[in-house]
A protein has these predicted regions:
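Short, small/hydrophobic-residue-rich motifs at membrane-helix boundaries and re-entrant hairpins
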Residues: 1-145, 149, 156-172, 176-198
Length: 198
């Protein structure tokens, strides 16, 4: 039987906390770039100037986009490693175990609608919708290919799209009779509650 919304939301939160902790731990093992520290300090100084009214909003946005683009360029190794970890956790592990850690703890399982074995297409589509995988991949390339202003605008637009996808999926899980989210429909998969017998 399809899992109820509260169990799915709790599983999502567990997964988010777990993957955030993993990424934080990994960040300690990736060599630090001293430029990033200086750029972060510059962003803080710039923000303080903007808050004090010392610079205009357009100047702030222009400078901020330069700093942000530079920081993300400097952090490319960490960003690539993060995407690899996200792919392993949200795409590969569910194929093998039919669940992420959060779903396993909540006794949920991801299956295909047609009851065949999950494949990479199913889990990749799920991850694009609710885990921000495509957002992460696109931003790695964008920071290398476009100007800092276009990069900032792209981040805002992509972030907004990702937010809308997650909220849409949440409302679908909460209010649809079959409890399917957008990721379930697009990937032709369902999340079932292993504790509930049909």
């Amino acid at each position: 039987m399809c899992a109820n919304a509260s169990k799915r939301i709790i599983a999502y939160i567990i997964d988010f906390i777990f993957i955030s902790a993993i990424l934080m731990i990994v960040s300690y093992f990736i060599p630090k770039n001293s430029n990033v520290e200086f750029l972060n300090k510059d962003i803080n100084d710039l923000t303080e100037q903007a808050l004090n009214g010392e610079i205009t909003f357009s100047s702030y946005a222009s400078e901020y986009s330069n700093y942000l683009s530079s920081i993300d360029s400097e952090n490319v190794v960490y960003n690539v490693v993060s995407v690899i970890i996200i792919i392993i956790y949200y795409v590969i592990i569910p194929i093998i175990f039919k669940a992420t850690l959060g779903k396993y703890i909540m006794k949920l399982e991801i299956t295909r609608e047609d009851t065949k074995k999950l494949n990479i297409f199913n889990t990749f589509i799920r991850s694009i919708v609710v885990d921000g995988l495509l957002y992460s991949i696109i931003t790695i390339f964008l920071v290398q290919l476009v100007s800092s202003k276009i990069y900032l605008i792209s981040l805002i637009i992509l972030g907004f799209i990702q937010f809308i996808l997650v909220i849409t999926s949440l409302f679908m899980i909460l209010y649809r009779h079959d409890k399917k989210g957008l990721q379930d429909i697009l990937s032709k998969s369902i999340v079932i509650d292993k504790e509930v017998k049909e």
